[in-house]
């Protein structure tokens, strides 16, 4: 069994725990590969065990950090590798275990006492070209000038769904329903569902409301506004776009896979949402 290890780079506790995990696996005879960016911030791993995330070819990834660490993994890895996530972030909607449970969780993984939780992702086409990372949480179309609204139309499966004047538009997965989409007034959606959430950001007037559409839907966005806009994917990738382009968003053929030890969803999500608000 071969493992990849990725840690949050701005917390020494996460980096030290990553080294303990690395040593724990190596002593027991398992292959362990460490993300090169983790190594740059904590250069105590063996150099022959270092690789870029884009080059990871492992059975599992152990992620030590918060949701941002998981999103970084998802944007850079080329394969759908199951992730065991250890929470060293702020809220940790995506993470599975706390730091104190790390080695208990790893032992359960080694014994096969887990299941794989698959989450849908979104693929974005700009003028028909899929050249940006898939989104685990959301794709956000944002105003390029603070204080200036975007005027756009969006279509669902070819039919006009709404014409919106707003600070932006968020298209989210159920996993991302607790993120930017919820800040835009969208609902919490069970992350196991196959749906897509569309939520305008501060629309004028407030007659434009969030909607939930089937996961097989194709969402097309065209701009009436003539100003530059910003496209943001999971808060990790940003690009300035001219308003004459067309955007299509649909479910990606790829999925995110998480190692889980319980099938309970609501206790954790309810607690995290209350902590956030």
From Swiss-Prot:
GO terms for molecular function: ATP binding; metal ion binding; NAD+ kinase activity. NAD(+) binds at residues 67-68, 72, 137-138, 148, 165, 167, 178-183, 202, 236. InterPro entries: ATP-NAD_kinase_N, ATP-NAD_kinase_PpnK-typ_C, NAD/diacylglycerol_kinase_sf, NADK. Its EC number is 2.7.1.23. GO terms for cellular component: cytoplasm. SUPFAM superfamilies: NAD kinase/diacylglycerol kinase-like (SSF111331). GO terms for biological process: NAD metabolic process; NADP biosynthetic process. Its main location: cytoplasm. Belongs to the NAD kinase family. PANTHER family: BIFUNCTIONAL NADP PHOSPHATASE_NAD KINASE, NAD KINASE. This is NAD kinase. It comes from Pyrococcus abyssi (strain GE5 / Orsay).
